[in-house]
Swiss-Prot record:
SASP are degraded in the first minutes of spore germination and provide amino acids for both new protein synthesis and metabolism. GO terms for biological process: DNA topological change; sporulation resulting in formation of a cellular spore. This is Small, acid-soluble spore protein C2. Pfam families: SASP. SASP are bound to spore DNA. They are double-stranded DNA-binding proteins that cause DNA to change to an a-like conformation. They protect the DNA backbone from chemical and enzymatic cleavage and are thus involved in dormant spore's high resistance to UV light. Keywords: DNA-binding, Sporulation. The keyword DNA-binding applies. The lineage of its organism: Bacteria, Bacillati, Bacillota, Bacilli, Bacillales. It comes from the Bacteria. Signal peptide: none annotated. The record marks 27-28 as: Cleavage.
Length: 73
């Protein structure tokens, strides 16, 4: 396994990314009808986190691939 010190923490590597991630989190929670807070279930929080990851991957794919659409095998 590679020795990657940043793999065990949630430290953001891009300055200013925290605000964008928080905005995305609340937008997605609103779309899903999830009220974020201490009383929110892990399943609801997980659905928001999973969607954030999905959208970030899509953004990265668009930037790296020049905006090409996804093809299926």
């Amino acid at each position: 396994m590679a020795n990657n010190k940043s793999s065990n923490n949630n430290e953001l590597l891009v300055y200013g990314a925290e605000q964008a991630i928080d905005q995305m989190k609340y937008e997605i929670a609103s779309e899903f009808g999830v009220n974020l807070g201490a009383d929110t279930t892990a399943r609801a929080n997980g659905s928001v986190g999973g969607e954030i990851t999905k959208r970030l991957v899509q953004l990265a794919e668009q930037q790296l691939g020049g905006g090409r659409s996804k093809t299926t095998l």
